[in-house]
């Protein structure tokens, strides 16, 4: 069967039967099936969100998505970036799972933190119940400072810190040739300085 046919079947069997009912929002835990097509996903995800909102006729229903966890040897970083672009739509939230995944298994066993993050985000977005910090740091912007890049983050709670308290060691930079190499990175307040 073609991909279009499969998508139509999924919609017709899983979503269309729910249209007559009132709902409070969507939780979307994307599998890795599309992870090899991040550029296409940048179009598909926002289109799906917009389409479902139109069909349910309830305005900007909250849409909460789970960003793919870390997996070694893949290109999921580009897909995670594509997923994050959906945050540009109104009333869309994201639960980051990169820190709770298993680098050798795209289907991590520990899903409790992901559920807790979705719960806190839903409490804030859907029920307007302020819960304080409900997510980890979110990239905001960057600026070039000589031969270094200063990355700014928001939603930093009590400040940026590494998970294990050690120096940051998973950053990479690329030159004009497009080849990535390991980079040094340090935390400065709510910023990360990379070179």
Region locations from a protein language model:
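Alpha-helical scaffolding within the catalytic cores
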Residues: 7-17, 43-53, 76-84
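Active-site rim elements
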Residues: 36-38, 101-111
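Substrate-gating cap/lid alpha-helix
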Residues: 68-100
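Oxyanion-hole/transition-state-stabilizing segment in secreted/luminal serine hydrolases
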Residues: 13-36
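Solvent-exposed beta-strand/loop surfaces of large extracellular or lumenal domains
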Residues: 173-193
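Surface beta-strand/loop "capping" patches
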Residues: 113, 120, 124-167, 185-187
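Short, small-residue-biased leader/transition segments that mark boundaries at the very start
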Residues: 1-5
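Loop/turn elements at helix/coil->beta-strand transitions in domains of secreted/extracellular proteins
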Residues: 21-25, 58-64, 88-94
């Amino acid at each position: 069967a073609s991909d279009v046919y499969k998508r139509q079947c999924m919609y017709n069997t899983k979503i269309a039967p729910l249209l007559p009912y009132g709902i409070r929002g969507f939780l979307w835990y994307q599998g890795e099936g599309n992870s090899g097509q991040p550029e296409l996903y940048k179009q598909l995800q926002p289109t799906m969100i917009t389409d479902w909102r139109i069909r349910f006729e309830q305005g900007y229903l909250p849409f909460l998505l789970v960003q793919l966890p870390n997996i070694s040897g893949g290109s999921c970083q580009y897909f995670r970036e594509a997923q994050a672009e959906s945050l540009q739509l109104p009333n869309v939230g994201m639960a980051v799972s990169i820190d709770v995944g298993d680098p050798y298994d795209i289907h991590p066993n520990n899903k409790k933190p992901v559920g807790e993050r979705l719960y806190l985000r839903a409490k804030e977005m859907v029920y307007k119940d302020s819960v304080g910090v409900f997510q980890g740091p979110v990239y905001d912007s960057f600026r070039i400072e000589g031969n270094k890049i200063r990355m700014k983050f928001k939603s930093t709670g009590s400040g940026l810190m590494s998970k294990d308290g050690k120096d940051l060691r998973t950053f990479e930079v690329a030159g004009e040739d497009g080849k990535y190499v390991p980079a040094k990175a340090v935390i400065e307040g709510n910023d990360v300085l990379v070179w």
